[in-house]
Amino acid sequence: MGFFSLMQELAIDLGTANTLIIYNGKVVVDEPSIIALELQSGKVKAIGTEAKKMDGRVHPNIKTIRPLKDGVIADFKATELMLRGLIKKVRTTSSMFSPSLRMVICIPSGSTNVEIRAVRDSAEHAGARDVYMIFEPMAAALGAGLDVEAPEGNMVIDIGGGTSEIACISLGGIVCSESINVAGDVFTTDIQNYVRQQHNIRIGERTAEEIKHAIGAAISDLDEEPEDFVLTGPNMLTALPQTVTLSYNEIAYALEKSLVKLDAALMTVLETMPPELYADIVKNGIYLAGGGALIKGLDKRLSNKSGLPVHIAEDPLRAVARGTSIAMKNVDKFSFLMHDN
């Protein structure tokens, strides 16, 4: 982009758990999708990482809000404020003029027209002049390096914070797909519930996420076993500190009921897929993206379930953001981008 360009282009992965912003092919913002507000004044106290540090530690006059739930906007005003604040963190120009903003934002493939409108309105209120949107499975496929416009089938499973999206893509379109509200946030809750029920220890979301990242597993026979996780928390009966050691096998057990739903959604898409595209998937395999792709052994589990090869996309946490950035560079080429003139 030239020095005198009046259009600033941002690719945004507006996720339930994290929001990523890419400018000039680089991730310039990667922060939790959370905002802290002062209740009486409505003033923004913190956004992103700083707000996440406050979560669970605030007094009654400050509230932390996660504006997105299950991949869609749950709080319009908070989303607008969060987006505006995160965009301000993008130091992209030294010009004395404020450039117009063009955004490409990824959204769940099951989004309703009302939900799509809410994303567009939030972007426009945050300063966007021109807004394009791309469905998350398409962005994940682009970010995984797949040719989404080729006359052959490609399959992606994008496991984010609020939703898991499973889609078969061919010729620039989503042929068949499933979107379920079983993803990272549900896995975190599963771990909280397990620790409470099995060990009588109450843990917060942040601790459960630490456990998930350290020993989260989809199968109980990993080739490389992670070290056990030592946890100290308040016993629910005595309120005294209690220490337990958690193994990855326990977490695999804790996640099992949710993972069975993911298995079923995958099989539903495979069963509804045209035979010609199925043959392509047998050859090309399935690509995993999103934070959930980092659950240990998930690729092996899904491969065993489907009988198909399963690959983890490079840097799966940023695959959707990468794909959104690729879409930004090709807004005039990709006919599958949604845009209101």
Locate predicted features.
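Nucleotide/phosphate-binding catalytic cleft detector across ATP-hydrolyzing
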Residues: M1-I159, A167-I286, A293-N341
